[in-house]
UniProtKB/Swiss-Prot annotation:
It catalyses: 7-aminomethyl-7-carbaguanosine(34) in tRNA + S-adenosyl-L-methionine = epoxyqueuosine(34) in tRNA + adenine + L-methionine + 2 H(+). This is S-adenosylmethionine:tRNA ribosyltransferase-isomerase. InterPro entries: QueA, QueA_dom1, QueA_dom2, QueA_sf. GO terms for cellular component: cytoplasm. Transfers and isomerizes the ribose moiety from AdoMet to the 7-aminomethyl group of 7-deazaguanine (preQ1-tRNA) to give epoxyqueuosine (oQ-tRNA). Pathway: tRNA modification; tRNA-queuosine biosynthesis. Pfam families: Queuosine_synth. One of its GO terms (biological process) is queuosine biosynthetic process. Its EC number is 2.4.99.17. It is found in: Cytoplasm. The lineage of its organism: Bacteria, Pseudomonadati, Pseudomonadota, Betaproteobacteria, Neisseriales. Belongs to the QueA family.
């Protein structure tokens, strides 16, 4: 398929630069199969969830992954931690006038010292000195890495608003943004209705913002991210399917974790590992029936994912409606509910 099939015109004013004033107050476009588009608010989500349905959340937590400093040679440097390997070692994207050489010392804010000890592709392996762990150093001295389309520096408000209320495990460099709309009160309402909540972990990497640079999407190489599906979640999903209930993925990262864990057999299995799953039109979904997601960038892999899930024509119509009604787009923007289109050619 051609990348131009996933392009659309988006007025710049619709790109949300700040979160809504109150968490959970965003708009919700309900775009389920076989029903007209509905303009709602996010607090109406329980209206579409049945007792016994399972909602699967990604419990990853965004690290303060951006560090500023200088090389021992004096040049300025910026590091974005992509993955923590152990208590003192991490892989990082490096921005500098010249790439650091193996063995070069780096000094970051707060007196953090690190040494480059190798490379893995475009990533540099950094070994941090001192007794504190990488996570502790980042929490004390790092900066929250907002997406590139948010054209401002992170502030104190982002420290809480760019995290979900259920975030547990550090490791992401970008938030699972569909989850940003959920409040504790809404989670209680869903449970009171009889919905089941379950969790996966997928540490969102910087590759989520990587543009597709090829004309034919089949030639695109997807980035890899670490994920885990606990046994309790696999059991909850299988039980829901057995009784005829729906499985909801809260966000594309939850969907990618679930579908990755079902790749081998077509049934969800507990486990962990790295995934580079690339979901495009023609993909056969094994787990997810409903998807809560934000609005995605033109020509992005996530727009391809939702097009695979609900059908390209359906997504085009929904996005055209969203632009006309001036929904807010991307990480701090509004949300939509999508259903799996069983009529999609697979």
């Amino acid at each position: 398929m051609d990348i131009s099939d996933f392009d659309f015109t988006l007025p710049e004013k619709l790109i949300a630069q700040h979160p809504p004033e109150v968490r959970g107050s965003s708009r919700l476009l309900v775009a389920l199969p076989d029903m007209p588009l509905q303009d709602r608010v996010f607090g109406d989500l329980p209206d579409y969830v049945e007792a016994g349905d399972v909602l699967v959340f990604n419990n990853t937590k965004v690290m303060k992954a951006r560090l500023f400093g200088q090389k021992d040679s004096g040049g300025r440097i910026e590091a974005l931690i992509e993955r923590v390997l152990d208590n003192h070692t991490a892989l990082a994207h490096i921005r500098s006038s010249k790439s650091p050489k193996p063995g070069m010392g780096l000094v970051f804010e707060g007196g953090i010292r690190a040494v480059t000890v190798g490379r893995e592709g475009e990533l540099f392996c950094l070994r941090f000195e001192g007794g504190e762990t990488v996570y502790e150093l980042l929490e004390q001295n790092g900066h929250l890495p907002l997406p590139p389309y948010i054209e401002r520096a992170a502030d104190a408000d982002d420290d809480s608003r760019y995290q979900t209320v259920y975030a547990k495990y550090q490791g992401a460099v970008a938030a699972p943004t569909a989850g940003l709309h959920f409040t504790e009160e809404l989670l209680h309402r869903l449970k009171d209705k009889g919905a089941v909540t379950a969790e996966v972990t997928l540490h969102v990497g910087a590759g989520t913002f990587q543009p597709v640079r090829v004309d034919k999407i089949e030639e695109h190489k997807m980035h890899s991210e670490w994920f885990e599906v606990p046994s309790e979640t696999a059991a909850a999903v299988e039980a829901a399917k057995a009784r005829g209930n729906k499985v909801w993925a809260v966000g594309t990262t939850s969907m990618r974790a679930l579908e990755s864990a079902a790749r081998a057999t077509g049934r969800l299995k507990a486990g962990q590992g790295d995934t580079d799953i690339f979901i495009t039109p023609g993909y056969r979904f094994n787990v997810v029936d409903r998807l809560v997601t934000n609005f995605h960038l033109p020509k992005s892999t996530l727009l391809m994912l939702v097009s695979a899930f609900s059908g390209m024509g359906h997504i085009r119509a929904a996005y055209r409606h969203a632009v006309e009604r001036e929904y807010r787009f991307f990480s701090y923007g509004d949300a939509m509910v999508l259903g799996r289109n069983e009529g999609v050619v697979r």
